[in-house]
Amino acid sequence: MSERIIMDDAAIQRTVTRIAHEILEYNKGTDNLILLGIKTRGEYLANRIQDKIHQIEQQRIPTGTIDITYFRDDIEHMSSLTTKDAIDIDTDITDKVVIIIDDVLYTGRTVRASLDAILLNARPIKIGLAALVDRGHRELPIRADFVGKNIPTSKEETVSVYLEEMDQRNAVIIK
């Protein structure tokens, strides 16, 4: 199976910077802005975007994580952990502008699960979505507000995102 590098380290860094600027424009600054990264790689991307926003605005915005494990629609038994344990952030997200961060947007089911987790716990003013890669093939009517790169793929192909924080390198690869 052949691999194609779609984004290298420099491309990922430029993309994170662009997404940070787009989020600031969308929100007209940092007021009431919250970033929630979908575990695991979305968490690292959210932290990178937070760092870029801090460099641009000299303000550190609240950033946390969403664990969608118990909100997925492909598991049979829901756990009692489906409430407050899904979102890990040190501030209330009610009446805030929440941006969900994910590495790859594919069918939309992961995003749907993250929306369920957020709305079970809070009532944000607005929810946006940022994805490093959008590969298409949606099964739900979900669209990202901020996309790093649109990558047309076949359903048989796999898009893998590698991030330094857990993979010791930065790259987006199609297999």
From Swiss-Prot:
Single Gene Ontology MF annotation: uracil phosphoribosyltransferase activity
Protein residues bound to substrate: T40, R41, D102, D103, V104, L105, Y106, T107, G108, R109, T110, R135, V159
Transferase found in the keyword field: yes
EC primary class: transferase
Annotated Gene3D superfamilies: 3.40.50.2020
Motif PRPP-binding location, chain numbering: 98-110
Presence of keyword Protein transport: no
Pfam families the record matches: Pribosyltran
Single GO BP term: DNA-templated transcription termination
Classification via InterPro entries: PRibTrfase_dom, PRTase-like, PyrR, PyrR_bifunctional
Catalysed reactions, as listed in the record: UMP + diphosphate = 5-phospho-alpha-D-ribose 1-diphosphate + uracil
E.C. number(s) listed in UniProt: 2.4.2.9
Top-rank taxon: Bacteria
Keywords, in A-Z order: Glycosyltransferase, RNA-binding, Transcription, Transcription regulation, Transcription termination, Transferase
Annotated family: Belongs to the purine/pyrimidine phosphoribosyltransferase family. PyrR subfamily.
PANTHER family in the cross-refs: BIFUNCTIONAL PROTEIN PYRR
Entries under NCBIfam families matching the protein: PRK05205.1-2, PRK05205.1-4, PRK05205.1-5
Cited function: Regulates transcriptional attenuation of the pyrimidine nucleotide (pyr) operon by binding in a uridine-dependent manner to specific sites on pyr mRNA. This disrupts an antiterminator hairpin in the RNA and favors formation of a downstream transcription terminator, leading to a reduced expression of downstream genes.
Subunit field text: Homodimer and homohexamer; in equilibrium.
Protein name as catalogued: Bifunctional protein PyrR
Gene of this entry: pyrR
